[in-house]
Amino acid sequence: MQAALTAFFMLFFSLLSLLGIAANGFIVLVLGREWLQYGRLLPLDMILISLGVSRFCLQLVGTVYNFYYSAHKVEYSGGLSRQFFHLHWHFLNLATFXFCSWLSVLFCVKXANITHPTFLWLKWRFPGWVPWLLLGSVLISFIITLLLFWVNYPVYQEFLIRKFSGNMTYEWNTRIEMYYLPSLKLVIWSIPCSVFLVSIMLLINSLRRHTWRMQHNGHSLQDPSTQAHTRAXKSLISFLILYVLSFLSLIIDATKFISMQNDFYWPWQTAVYLGVSVHPFILIFSNLKLRSVFWKLLLLARGFWVA
């Protein structure tokens, strides 16, 4: 029974990964084609293509890692492949979290109806900052990944040089890996998460105040401003659920609470990569440009199938 359940979740994880890779690849191809055609992208499209690239690579790396690890448990636990994977995994996760945060900020400054001078200044300046914020996120993610590798290196160096430096050093290295590194990762991941939460709270509060004002004045709730707020809020709420799920899964993964030998490993990996696989479809169907191309391709595929 347990073997059948594991096989089911492995298959489900594989299908989810293929869907995520296809959806993120679709976003990258559509926006990349527009970039090549016109030589420029809107701030929203810059964030979406960056997010699509990072998620595409993250999904690909995660899929290869999980199946390689399941096939080479002993070799992987003490080899260079573990370090190689974690370098890429940490970098892509940090970059993805940062891109998600900038996407939420852009939604907020575009849709929130806030008259504070600081917010109005940010609303005017933020779109021009987007390219530099994306580049800065990549550079900071790269630097933090190298620092994490440098801090974590003593834990693995006995495997790399194939000798131990004594029980005291080994115990100290184990303590670093089990206690200090998860705390450090929690602090690092909390920064983009805080930016995301502040943005979504501001937008939801703006929608609440706008709705109350319209009700108080007796106007229809179907006006364009309210509908724009509602669409953005629905997108961000779904985004928030998937974002929080990804954040919690990273925290649990950092504590090594669920290992490959655990019966819940594959269900947990499905939950870890759920946001990376599902949210691209939300972005596609909430974006007019991506949605129109998607339906055109679907109709084209249907025509070939019928023919």
Swiss-Prot record:
Keyword annotations of the record: G-protein coupled receptor, Glycoprotein, Membrane, Receptor, Sensory transduction, Taste, Transducer, Transmembrane, Transmembrane helix
Cytoplasmic face residues: 29-40, 110-129, 205-234, 286-307
Extracellular side: 1-7, 62-88, 151-183, 256-264
Molecular function terms from GO: bitter taste receptor activity; G protein-coupled receptor activity
GO CC annotation, single: plasma membrane
Pfam families in alphabetical order: TAS2R (PF05296)
Chief place of localization: membrane
Record flagged with keyword Zinc: no
Transmembrane segments: 8-28, 41-61, 89-109, 130-150, 184-204, 235-255, 265-285
Cited InterPro entries: TAS2R
Superkingdom of the organism of origin: Eukaryota
Keyword Plastid in record: no
Protein family (similarity comment): Belongs to the G-protein coupled receptor T2R family.
Note: Most taste cells may be activated by a limited number of bitter compounds; individual taste cells can discriminate among bitter stimuli.
Primary role: Receptor that may play a role in the perception of bitterness and is gustducin-linked. May play a role in sensing the chemical composition of the gastrointestinal content. The activity of this receptor may stimulate alpha gustducin, mediate PLC-beta-2 activation and lead to the gating of TRPM5.
Name under which the protein is recorded: Taste receptor type 2 member 41
